[in-house]
A protein has these predicted regions:
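Bacterial N-terminal signal peptides that target proteins for export
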Residues: 3-21
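Envelope-exposed proteins and targeting segments
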Residues: 57-62, 75-77, 127-131, 148-154, ...
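Generic short beta-strand segments
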Residues: 66, 134-139, 171-173
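Short secondary-structure boundary motifs at beta->alpha junctions and helix caps
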Residues: 85-96, 163-201, 208
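Sec-exported extracytoplasmic/periplasmic mature domains
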Residues: 110, 114-118, 200-208
């Protein structure tokens, strides 16, 4: 009888601890689920833009939307396992860009070039020299299972009154700090900034007249 009473007393004493443990377990599970959900729906952009050196002020320039092939004309995050199959592109299942890379680069480029003069869009009716960018590569390239880099390649064409004033292909590379989408996003942001800086410097060296 005495043992039965002691067992009931012990059970009552342990109930609060058991309830607290259960609540803690549920909280941890909810936290893990929330974290996993966040990680499984990651959205990346290029981050804040850094300063771009320009060669003084220049005339107005019309900057068209960056053009891209179908594979890069979406918010999918593209990567390539160069060490295993360099000809095959793949996409992350749970990581995407906030907008197609071409749109992100368009914003970045217009922002950088605006520091040297007025930047017009393609829909503007003003006659002005026109810069067209054709994006051909924007991906995280894995050189090994634990090593990757961001790769961005684009061709810039500057025209005025139907005449080509200059054309050049630009290539930018930046190492990834981690072999995953987060590391790839940081690397591609750095490579994008490098590419934009190269294009801005090239535009600054071209000889073209302003609007009449």
């Amino acid at each position: 009888m005495q043992e039965h009473v002691m067992s009931r007393t012990l059970a009552r004493a342990l109930r609060p601890a058991a309830a607290a443990l259960a609540a803690l377990t549920l909280a941890l599970a909810a936290g893990c689920a929330s974290e996993n959900a966040a990680l499984s729906n990651a959205r990346y952009d290029l981050g804040p833009a850094g300063p771009v050196a320009t060669a003084g002020r220049g005339p107005a320039l019309k900057v068209l939307d960056v053009a891209a092939p179908e594979a890069l004309d979406s918010d999918k995050f593209v990567y390539r396992l160069a060490y295993a199959d360099a000809q095959r592109m793949a996409v992350y299942r749970d990581s995407r860009w906030t907008a197609p890379p071409a749109q992100l680069l368009t914003q970045r480029l217009r922002g950088a070039l605006s520091s040297r003069g007025a930047v017009l869009e393609g829909a503007d009716g003003v006659r002005a020299p026109t810069l067209r960018i054709d994006l051909s590569e924007f991906e995280q390239v894995f050189d090994g299972e634990s090593q990757s880099h961001g790769a961005v390649t684009a061709r810039a064409t500057l025209t005025q009154d139907g005449k080509v004033l200059g054309q050049r292909t630009f290539v930018a590379r930046a190492p990834s700090s981690t072999p995953d989408a987060a590391g790839g996003a940081r690397a591609l942001a750095m490579a994008s900034d490098d590419l934009v800086a190269q294009i801005a410097a090239w535009v600054g060296m071209q000889a073209y007249a302003g609007t009449p």
